[in-house]
Curated annotation (Swiss-Prot):
Keywords: Host cytoplasm, Host Golgi apparatus, Host nucleus, Late protein, Virion
Family per similarity comment: Belongs to the herpesviridae UL24 family.
Gene from which this protein is expressed: U49
Source organism of this protein record: Human herpesvirus 6B (strain Z29) (HHV-6 variant B)
Name listed for the protein in its UniProt record: Protein UL24 homolog
Main location: virion
Length: 252
């Protein structure tokens, strides 16, 4: 099954929950332990003191990975100067597992789409390889979150790719290739305003408003019809009603 066959509303709900995940990552960026726990403990312990940079929805050629977490290692024994994690997030209504990925057609389609996204995004960096630059460890990760409560059901961390890249150039590339609309949403400090803005961004707010308006209109039109019926009965000629009643009585 292709994800293009999903109802439009399901895609919009998925986009909305992606934004919630991004906001949570930003709130945990300064706390390595909590950020690592939220993402499935994918970062090794020796990166606990590393500086962390986060990028969202970075356009890399034909692909846009959901999130890139870049950690600058301060461990003298670490062969890599930088550890770069490419994340692809999938959200589901029910619980997802590796078994459901094999048997649930939607979960399977999400998983395969995520793999293609990660592979092509990381391969895009190959055009920027520089022989005498520092070593990077580029790691692809796919995470399945339950939409209710943003619970991480399961994740898959794949083997890292070793690349020699320029830190300043790649950081600049990531920063300027982010989605501007997403950055504006994530900059909203108040959570209630953020949630409402996300609903508007994904068109969910408009749908909810239209649904509510339709309900109100239906109720109002029903009330108007009832009022009109009562008014007709009220305005009916009373003499005519009485004469009709007398005729019926004589016939009996």
């Amino acid at each position: 099954m292709s994800l293009t066959g999903l109802p439009d509303i399901r895609k919009k709900i998925g986009q909305f929950h992606h934004l919630r995940i991004y906001k949570q990552i930003l709130s945990l960026q300064g706390n390595f332990a909590r950020l690592n726990y939220f993402l499935g403990d994918v970062f090794p312990a020796n990166l606990r003191s590393a500086s962390v940079s986060v990028f969202f929805e970075v356009r890399l050629g034909p692909r846009i990975p959901d999130c890139i977490v870049l950690l600058k290692s301060v461990d003298a024994k670490d062969e890599f100067a930088f550890h770069c994690y490419f994340f692809e997030f999938k959200t589901t209504l029910g619980k997802s597992t590796m078994q459901s990925v094999h048997h649930n057609c939607i979960h399977q389609a999400q998983y395969l789409q995520g793999l293609r996204q990660l592979h092509q995004s990381i391969s895009f960096l190959d055009q920027y390889l520089i022989a005498d630059e520092v070593l990077w460890n580029v790691v692809p990760v796919i995470c399945f979150f339950r939409q209710w409560g943003l619970k991480l059901d399961f994740f898959k961390k794949f083997s890292g790719k070793t690349k020699r890249l320029s830190f300043s150039f790649i950081c600049d590339l990531f920063a300027r290739s982010q989605d501007g609309a997403v950055q504006s949403l994530l900059s909203i400090p108040n959570y209630t305003n953020f949630r409402r803005a996300c609903q508007k961004h994904t068109d969910l707010y408009r749908r909810r408003y239209q649904k509510a308006s339709k309900s109100v209109l239906t109720k109002t039109s029903g009330e108007n019809r009832s009022r009109a019926s009562r008014q007709v009965a009220k305005n009916a000629p009373k003499n005519r009603i009485r004469r009709t009643a007398k005729k019926d009585a004589k016939r009996q």
